[in-house]
Amino acid sequence: MKLSARSCASIFAVAALSTIGLLGQAQGSRSPKQIALTEDGFPYVRGEYLVKVRSSAALERLLDNQFETAGAVSRKVPVLNSKSGTWYKINLADDHKLRDAILSARESADVIYAEPNYIYHTTSQNEKNIPMPGKGGKGGPDYKEAPTLPVPPVADPQISGMYGLSKIGAQQAWQITSGSSKVLVADIDTGVDYNHQDLINNMWRNPAEVAGDGIDNDANGYIDDIVGWDFRDKDARPFDDNSHGSHTSGTIAATGGNGIGVSGVAQQASIMALRFLGGSQGSGSLEDAIKAIDYATENGAQIMSNSWGGGGYSQAMFDAISRANDKGILFVAAAGNSGTDNDSKPQYPASYQLPNVLTVAATDSADKLASFSCYGVKAVHLAAPGVKILSTTPGDKYASLSGTSMAAPHVTGAAVLLKTAYPKMKAKELKAVLMDSVEQLGALEGKVSTGGRLNISKAFAISKAMFGESESGN
């Protein structure tokens, strides 16, 4: 039996989770065929794997080989992302044949690499304690118009409860700049309550798209993508059904000076909402993560915030983050919450050794490493406040959460401020300045490569010495 490319054109998502014990290849140039399949038990989407082949003809040969050597029936083979090369997702009728199918694919001269469609999850400690919003995910609410902000600015009433801002020197940095809507930051997460009273003014509005006309006006492959995209449910309303993504977005850039609620580290920004995680567990697939990263890369994001992890090493994800690096985009990643050493037990995407990846551990209000936080003197770069962090949640609400998920957005917000003041800074410069300017802490010595916690006030002092006066401000 042979499947043609035409007969394999549709997509079929499978949500069931399992474990396969397939570990992706190690980093660097090693061939995946040299890496043994282990029993580490990473979760994956049942019956699915991703494969990169040399040509469409190679895909046909691979499918034929799957029937003969793995005894598996390939049902659907869609292109994963036409702009990222010949990546395909293969669905097998029998999940028990997945291990054999990947092994046989890796032995084929037509295959560059093959890996399971891993599952990822949020890196917050306690989303379960926050009530789930009643309406989210597929079919989220219509976009509302942003209200006019008060002039002059009015103090945010809950800002006194945000110890993280004072720890990192945010108020001092605001004397230079509070951010700018010109800085586009992609929050890749569970979606965002894009109508939240403290977020609506800082949501990205795709200038090349007309809302609700059913036309892909900007020809980017996504119809009516006004504030971003929902890759989990495949629609234009990336509304948060978990609370996690709204919380991380609020830490990055809740509107400052509107007299409501809280403030982000950056009081102004443009937040691109990219949802690939969802549900009460805040989970999503490798396939959708790659699509979200590529969307951000191709649609103008300058910084990406990533408070999620899980799964084994993925060459597909490594390549996607590399494409972002090629465009100078900073990729901020949460270190993970297992309390383990990322140098010896890598967490992904935090442990990808790429120039644009900046990995963040969590500290508490006493500047101690959080008990749950992953660390690593090589793999983790710096720390930021991540315990009992107050921020936005769906439905115009607020809550305190803990996790490296909460630490990473502090660094993202700091990067927004630097990018506002020094627009020519790319990922390499942003990463270097944020690392070189940390507040040295004894509790972090030997735990993160810099030995310190984020200090945006010092980052501006270093930037001034390196690049001169800022180019923009309040």
Predicted stretch roles:
Residues 263, 292, 297-308, 315-316, ...:
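C-terminal subdomain of the subtilisin-like protease fold in secreted/lumenal serine endopeptidases
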Residues 1-12:
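Bacterial N-terminal signal peptides that target proteins for export
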Residues 50-52, 89, 113-115, 184-187, ...:
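Structural recognition of the beta-strand scaffold that forms the well-ordered cores
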Residues 171-285, 302, 325, 354-356, ...:
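Subtilisin-like serine protease catalytic core
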Residues 329, 347-420, 424, 428-432, ...:
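Extracellular S/T/G-rich loop segment that most often corresponds to the catalytic His/Ser-adjacent loop
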Residues 11-20:
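Bacterial N-terminal signal peptides
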Residues 30, 81-82, 107-184, 192-203, ...:
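Protease zymogen maturation seam
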